A protein has these predicted regions:
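Helix-to-loop junction immediately C-terminal to a conserved catalytic motif
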Residues: 48
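Conserved catalytic motifs of ABC-family nucleotide-binding domains
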Residues: 73-83, 87
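Conserved ABC ATPase "signature" region
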Residues: 93-108
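Conserved ABC ATPase signature
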Residues: 112-116, 120
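H-loop/switch region of ABC-family ATPase nucleotide-binding domains
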Residues: 173-174
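Conserved ABC ATPase "signature" C-loop
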Residues: 191-192
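C-terminal boundary and immediately downstream tail of ABC-type ATPase nucleotide-binding domains
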Residues: 201-222
Length: 222
């Protein structure tokens, strides 16, 4: 379980992230959504321990060693796709070939990272995170450079593995269909605040005025 209490983080300018209370139960898959600059990446960095809060606390069952975090621009090691993914494996029992197939990387297994396109590189980093079998995954726009068809396949692989392993997921995305596909709950942010936090099935009927406006924009973008 992840519990956030009285969290505050002042960034440059006037932006302050302020989350009074947030609880993410074990095994939940939470899609983190909102406009650019709403605080999604900031919240992920704080939970991941990349940044320290100015106030408040974040409580996680287990330790930082149980959390896998992928930022928007993840680091890639030199060498092949296979080497990169193996470096992310915490358990040698992982079926690497099955994971490569799930992520559409079988044909790229021996390709050098330097020769990959942006979308291929992002798929590789995504597969590397799945290879870790983390109890908790924090993913910041992990499929933003991937085409829609490939994204649908990767979303399915993510959900399947999370359900199979009981993984807790917190993933930011700007795509409505993706948020609905991967999540059991949706967290909507604006100006560093949590506006809505509800079951995915109920999100299309928001309580707040901002939520209603946001949903209307989503409908236009579908």
């Amino acid at each position: 379980m992840i519990r956030v209490e009285g969290l505050r983080k002042q960034l440059t300018g006037e932006f302050t992230l302020a989350v009074d209370e947030l609880v993410i139960e074990d095994g939940e898959r939470v899609a983190l959504i909102g406009m650019n600059g709403s605080g999604k990446s900031t919240l992920l960095k704080l939970i991941a321990g990349e940044w320290a809060p100015d106030e408040g606390r974040i409580l996680c069952d287990g330790s930082a060693a149980t959390i896998g975090y992928q930022p928007q621009s993840p680091f890639c090691f030199r060498g092949t796709v296979e080497k990169n993914i193996r470096l992310g494996m915490r358990d040698e029992a992982i079926d690497l070939d099955a994971l490569l197939a799930d992520c559409g990387l079988t044909e790229l297994k021996q390709k050098k990272v330097s020769d990959l396109s942006g979308g291929e590189r992002q798929r590789m980093c995504f597969a590397r995170m799945l290879a870790g079998n983390w109890p908790c995954l924090l993913l910041d726009e992990p499929l933003s450079a991937v085409d829609i068809r490939t994204s649908r396949s990767l979303e399915g692989a993510l959900v399947h593995r999370c359900e199979e392993q009981g993984t807790t997921l917190l993933m930011s995305t700007h795509l409505p269909a993706q948020a609905m596909a991967v999540s059991t709950k949706i967290l909507l942010m604006d100006a560093g605040r949590v506006i809505e936090y509800t079951d995915t099935a109920d999100f299309l009927h928001p309580q707040s005025e901002f939520g209603k406006e946001f949903i209307a924009q989503w409908e236009i973008r579908k």
